[in-house]
């Protein structure tokens, strides 16, 4: 039986990803996205979760660190605030932070499993999003209940669909100016394959999702993003435990597309962990590979002359972002 904890060691056996990136081993001078992981608590414990969120996790970002994130966002000229978790709604400062983030004029994205909005204390969240014009990125493993719940667990599909309907009633996914006060309310869905396979063609999958969700549930949305599962965290452990790591990695490496390298998300963003530690992306957070400079968001908040441009830390889970048409 393989040691399922040694995912990083297993990944290191493959051809080094960093050799593939050439001149793109640095970030851009001007970063556009500040991605903030505000906590690892979640009402789900999905099989593919790279950050290993679950109801048992207690890590959460403090208000002080959130305030530092807002300061860095303004000082460094970011244009997008991307809030993730866990289920980010479970952070006690979430609503306050959403209001503060929206007040900056940024494009504010929240990532959600949506079903959290049917749990006690979170029922008002969809109305908050609509009021503030928040962009909602919702994960939906499949439009077929049985397939979706194979990845997420029993009882997860119906509440997700009900909340999606609520969002549509509020004006989400209906095009420009359909929301309150003429806002454009964007609802995007995120699809991850359930096993050791690459995602299907994104355009074809989006057409299929739009047709099925509209016909069966009366749901509209804007975009579908097909994301390859990064071979780290809970998914990486499962690959090792089932003997599928080698097969999956060979698929990723075989599908490497050099045209996706310039647009890797790590080149345009800074990712902040719940405790303020800085990473090149959320996947690097999952395998605990911090930025080379070893800084915390507090360092940048206190000293805004620290350069935003940096060397990027690469490892072999990065193949997931550059397979096929890319997942950044």
PLM feature segments, named:
Residues 22-25, 255-259, 306-309:
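Short, P/G- and charge-enriched loop/turn segments at secondary-structure junctions
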Residues 272-273:
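Short, acidic, Ser/Thr-enriched surface-loop or helix-capping motifs
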Residues 30, 45, 77, 132-133, ...:
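Short loop/turn motifs at secondary-structure junctions
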Residues 2-85, 89-100, 104-106:
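Conserved alpha-helical substructure of the radical SAM core
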Residues 42, 46-49, 266, 276, ...:
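Short cysteine clusters
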Residues 141-265:
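Radical SAM enzyme [4Fe-4S]-AdoMet core and its adjacent flexible, acidic
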Residues 63-83, 91-192:
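Radical SAM/AdoMet-radical enzyme domain recognition
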Residues 277-328:
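Flexible mid-to-C-terminal extensions adjoining Fe-S/redox cofactors in radical SAM and related proteins
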